[in-house]
Amino acid sequence: MRQQQAGGVGDGVSPGNVPVCYYGPGGRVPSSLERRARAAEVLLRCAACGLAVLAAALLGADRQTRVFFSIQKVARYTDMQSLVLLVIANGMAACYSLIQCARCLVMAYIVISAVAAAMEAALIGKYGQPEFQWMKTCHLYKRFCAQAGGGVACAIAASVNMVGVALISAFNLFRLYGNSNGGGKATTTTMAGGK
């Protein structure tokens, strides 16, 4: 294996002919930037995990009983499939964050789609849909709707943190592979013996 200099002095190794760029003094990323990026990523991961657990707990424990004409009606999160999806997605995201600790966009997309579905159902519950003759129900189950709203708000915050983690992960990945004819220095490793 032979290492060639492509555009300057560098000491990175890449598989094949891919130029690897390091920016900063001495061809490296400044350690203060690296520490801040890692600290921000850990903070966002912990916040996303905590908020996902909180959202799943708030929604999973949400129930309210009302009496209508001597008939008891219980409102639970299982009455709306989008809230069930949101509880499952947040539970998965929390477990994934605790166990895997890998940089993956899939969980961010799952939680964002579950939040969108739950927000749609929450808005229908709050305002109804007169075109389809769906009546609003939040004036009947105020505590249930308030707790569900808190769970959805925590899920939104968790998804924002997951997107932040995904952005930091993407930055860490793509900063290594840049334009070798630009200002950055690149080192190329080739498997072949020729120039």
Curated annotation (Swiss-Prot):
Q: Name one GO cellular component term.
A: plasma membrane
Q: List membrane-spanning regions.
A: 39-59, 82-102, 105-125, 151-171
Which top-rank group of organisms is this from?
A: Eukaryota
Extracellular side stretches = 60-81, 126-150
Membrane disposition: Multi-pass membrane protein
Keywords attached to this Swiss-Prot or TrEMBL record, sorted alphabetically, are: Cell membrane, Membrane, Transmembrane, Transmembrane helix
Subcellular location(s): the record lists: Cell membrane
Q: Which residues lie on this side of the membrane: Cytoplasmic?
A: 1-38, 103-104, 172-195
Please give the subunit comment from the record: Homodimer and heterodimers.
Q: Which NCBIfam families has this protein been placed in?
A: A_tha_TIGR01569
Family statement drawn from the similarity comment of this UniProt entry: Belongs to the Casparian strip membrane proteins (CASP) family.
Q: What is this protein called?
A: CASP-like protein Os03g0196400
Lineage, opening ranks? Eukaryota, Viridiplantae, Streptophyta, Embryophyta, Tracheophyta
